[in-house]
Amino acid sequence: MSCEELEIVWNNIKAEARTLADCEPMLASFYHATLLKHENLGSALSYMLANKLSSPIMPAIAIREVVEEAYAADPEMIASAACDIQAVRTRDPAVDKYSTPLLYLKGFHALQAYRIGHWLWNQGRRALAIFLQNQVSVTFQVDIHPAAKIGRGIMLDHATGIVVGETAVIENDVSILQSVTLGGTGKSGGDRHPKIREGVMIGAGAKILGNIEVGRGAKIGAGSVVLQPVPPHTTAAGVPARIVGKPDSDKPSMDMDQHFNGINHTFEYGDGI
């Protein structure tokens, strides 16, 4: 995302906040504190994350210092946040404003907090990264290990119960619904978590376990248990999951179609890929 595009997103957010404050005076001070008083998206994000994740052990001012330090060192995190906002705005029919993810959606908040934790992890500040991971888990019910690698243009829809393991990879333009697990298969160490390629959509409650690849543009049905690699541009569903067809689009994450189009298999218990 270019500087100009980032500025457009931020300007849209502030314009919405002004309109919202005029329409609902009871929330005018809220919109001012969270959006209107800030000069840029990074400032608003640091304020929001600090206040969401503060605790008696680490007050908001201390968390905000950490967030601002991370953003100063790696401004691309702010651009990634803007891409995530655009992803939610364009994919979630319940979201009609750019400001909504920033103000209200815990999936977005958890993802931005993960980005800070990931930066801390890579800086060798792993104790603080794990502390932040715990705060995110307690506050948002989303557990993303700070060592996981996640791209931009990500939507964590509803988000409650999402788990992403230490060696998981999520590429750009992926949509993940609530209660999804990207987990391991046991207690062995090493590279043990799924690799989710660009454009994938993972339905609610799906469990993808082990060091397996879900190929570009694949779709995972809600409630599925995926134990084997999923080829690109296929639809997998069931317990255990098997290939049941192909998505209608190149990137199922963009259209969020939950139907299984072109099903070519009738499920029986125990079928698998």
From Swiss-Prot:
Record GO biological process: cysteine biosynthetic process from serine; response to X-ray
The pathway this protein participates in, as annotated, is: Amino-acid biosynthesis; L-cysteine biosynthesis; L-cysteine from L-serine: step 1/2
Record's Gene Ontology CC terms? cysteine synthase complex; cytosol
Activity control mechanisms: Sensitive to feedback inhibition by L-cysteine.
Which InterPro entries does the entry link to? Answer: Hexapep, Hexapep_transf_CS, LbH_SAT, Ser_AcTrfase_N, Ser_AcTrfase_N_sf, Ser_O-AcTrfase, Serine_acetyltransferase, Trimer_LpxA-like_sf
Record PROSITE patterns: HEXAPEP_TRANSFERASES (PS00101)
What sort of enzyme, by top EC class, is this?
transferase
Q: SUPFAM superfamilies, alphabetically?
A: Trimeric LpxA-like enzymes
Q: What Enzyme Commission number(s) does the record list for this chain?
A: 2.3.1.30
Subcellular location(s): the record lists: Cytoplasm
> Quaternary arrangement and interactors, per the entry?
Homohexamer; dimer of a homotrimer. Forms a cysteine synthase complex with 2 copies of CysK.
The entry sums up its family as follows: Belongs to the transferase hexapeptide repeat family.
UniProt name for this protein: Serine acetyltransferase
